[in-house]
């Protein structure tokens, strides 16, 4: 019978609980730390607790959980608090179970929660419903650990029965409840927190962050592909070190390929913040809040840690999870297998004439967007017509915007958008928060039709059309994720981004901005597959005035 081998590693051990750093020799046996022996000398490299992303939608990386993990461990991450909200809106409970199954057995703390808002609103068509009864059933499971971001803050404040039943189910299960209330303040914020909600990752202003912390909330500093709030919020690290965590929320493939939570750790240390406070935010605080059984380099702990060259460059030399070296400084040591494909995509190709918009007035409401901003404005503009039909007008930067129901064949919803600067071609994609219908923008109806139909034929993806040429990033898993590795998906995503740049838009990420133009929960004027929607009055509105 083979005896388990003891692994011995030396380094300067960073003990964030006792706030000390010392040269040490640690022994690892059966996935746990056996002995920690001080050596009394500088050991060169440093041993730190592994990083945990405190809030992420893995689907936004456009790869499956297994592929996400492969990338994350390269950057020193050992866990992620994951809200499978995107796939749940497409496939419901089946989608949640798909994510669990895909991550199963991989040494990584993939800490999934139960999505709280499926569908996000009743003003659009999603692929599934997870009601209060189903939420309660899911929260009883041992592999689902929290109620994910409660975006329906009006429902909380107005004590909507369905919303309150979900919150009570989480309380009864003894599981934390995540929040989503960016501009909350005063009595409304207090009532929101008193309902049992304990975190918020949507904070964008420092004073709002301070107010939330004063009321006992945990504030997550977010630095991802879409929203970047670190520069505004980093003073909270010193002011409320026990209540701050780091998260990405959404990390697109090329972003995750280059870094993860390690980016914020390095930025914080470069700004001179206390090492132990920074590492608390990156590891200890999320582990304690979500009851993740990660180790912190103590005798008897699970052997979860990273080895870095120094505390300035933070070059990851190795990542260990449960005693297994999952990254050796050059490559991830975990095997990667092509995932099983699951989807919910039933619409048929759209004919050209369905994209025509007959002018029914002299002025129209236009969605005005800004690069990387979720909030839009409503402005009125004279219509630009040809033969009685409204067309895109690149001179005024007013382009046709289309949302098409992916779950069944139905007429498209069409509006017009200003701010993208698009001069050529069209883009269509099956990533459109939160219901993930097909959203498209284009200069000509032909290019719009071409891009949309390529996405439909592939049953998901991002397509860029210009003249007769179409480039596609296929996303065959729920129309949201690739079945390839993160590295390959990142390469193909960068190819798509390059094609988009050739369409002459000045935006940093038109694809990302486009994905939020159907997000009805965020003001002001957005497009649902059911029509143009005013998010402030929470009512549909007409295109023509």
Swiss-Prot record:
Which Pfam families does the record match to this protein? Adenine_deam_C, Amidohydro_1
What EC number(s) does the entry state? Answer: 3.5.4.2
Q: Which GO terms describe its molecular function?
A: adenine deaminase activity
Q: What class of enzyme is it?
A: hydrolase
Cite the InterPro entries for this sequence.
Answer: Adenine_deam (IPR006679), Adenine_deam_C (IPR026912), Amidohydro-rel (IPR006680), Metal_Hydrolase (IPR032466)
Q: Which UniProt keywords apply?
A: Hydrolase, Manganese
Give yes or no: UniProt keyword Manganese.
yes
* BP GO annotations: adenine catabolic process
* Swiss-Prot/TrEMBL catalytic activity: adenine + H2O + H(+) = hypoxanthine + NH4(+)
Names of required cofactors: Mn(2+)
HAMAP family hit by this protein: Adenine_deamin
> Can you tell me which family this protein belongs to?
Belongs to the metallo-dependent hydrolases superfamily. Adenine deaminase family.
Q: What name appears for this protein in its UniProt entry?
A: Adenine deaminase
Which species does the entry assign this protein to?
A: Parabacteroides distasonis (strain ATCC 8503 / DSM 20701 / CIP 104284 / JCM 5825 / NCTC 11152)
- Gene symbol here is ade
């Amino acid at each position: 019978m083979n005896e388990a081998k003891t692994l011995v590693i030396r380094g300067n051990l960073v003990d964030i609980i006792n706030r000390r750093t010392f040269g040490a020799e640690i022994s690892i046996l059966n996935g746990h730390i056996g002995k920690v022996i001080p050596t009394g000398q500088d050991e060169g490299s440093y041993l730190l607790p592994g990083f945990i992303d405190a809030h992420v939608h893995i689907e936004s990386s456009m790869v499956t959980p297994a592929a996400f993990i492969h990338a994350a461990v390269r950057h020193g991450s050992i866990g992620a608090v994951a809200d499978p909200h995107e796939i749940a809106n497409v496939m419901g409970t089946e989608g949640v179970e798909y994510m669990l199954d895909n991550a199963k057995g991989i040494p990584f703390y993939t800490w999934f929660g139960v999505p709280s808002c499926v569908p996000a609103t009743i003003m659009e068509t999603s692929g599934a419903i997870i009601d209060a009864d189903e939420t309660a059933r899911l929260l009883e499971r041992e592999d689902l650990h929290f109620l994910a971001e409660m975006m329906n803050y009006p429902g909380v404040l107005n004590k909507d029965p369905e919303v309150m039943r979900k919150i009570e189910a989480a309380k009864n299960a003894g599981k934390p409840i995540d929040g989503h209330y960016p501009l909350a303040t005063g009595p409304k914020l207090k009532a929101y927190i008193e309902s049992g909600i304990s975190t918020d990752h949507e904070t964008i202003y420092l004073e709002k962050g301070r107010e939330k912390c004063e009321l006992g909330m945990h504030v997550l500093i977010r630095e991802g592909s879409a929203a970047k709030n670190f520069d505004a919020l980093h003073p909270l690290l010193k002011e409320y070190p026990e209540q701050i965590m780091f998260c990405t929320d959404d990390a697109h493939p090329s972003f995750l390929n280059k870094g993860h939570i390690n980016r914020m750790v390095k930025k914080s240390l470069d700004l001179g913040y206390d090492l132990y406070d920074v590492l608390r935010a990156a590891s200890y605080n999320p582990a304690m809040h979500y009851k993740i059984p990660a180790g912190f380099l103590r005798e008897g702990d699970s052997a979860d840690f990273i080895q870095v060259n120094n505390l300035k460059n933070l070059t990851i030399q190795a990542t260990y999870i449960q005693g297994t070296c999952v990254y050796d400084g050059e490559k991830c040591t975990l095997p990667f297998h092509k995932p099983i494909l699951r989807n919910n995509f039933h619409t048929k190709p759209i004919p050209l004439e369905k994209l025509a918009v007959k002018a029914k007035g002299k002025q129209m409401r236009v969605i005005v967007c800004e690069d990387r901003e979720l909030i839009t404005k409503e402005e009125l503009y004279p219509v630009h017509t040809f033969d009685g039909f409204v067309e895109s007008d690149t001179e005024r930067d007013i382009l046709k915007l289309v949302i098409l129901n992916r779950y069944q064949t139905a007429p498209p919803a069409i509006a017009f958008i200003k701010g993208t600067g698009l001069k050529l071609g069209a883009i269509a994609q099956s990533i459109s928060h939160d219901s993930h219908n097909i959203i498209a923008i284009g200069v000509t109806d032909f290019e719009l039709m071409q891009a949309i139909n390529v996405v439909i034929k592939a049953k998901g993806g991002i397509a860029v059309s210009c003249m007769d040429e179409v480039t596609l990033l296929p996303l065959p898993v729920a129309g949201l994720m690739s079945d390839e590795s993160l590295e390959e998906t990142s390469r193909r995503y960068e190819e798509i981004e390059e094609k988009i740049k050739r369409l002459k838009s000045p935006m940093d990420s038109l694809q990302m901005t486009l994905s939020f133009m159907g997000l009805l929960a965020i003001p002001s004027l957005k497009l649902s597959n059911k029509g143009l929607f005013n998010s402030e009055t929470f009512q549909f509105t007409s295109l023509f005035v």
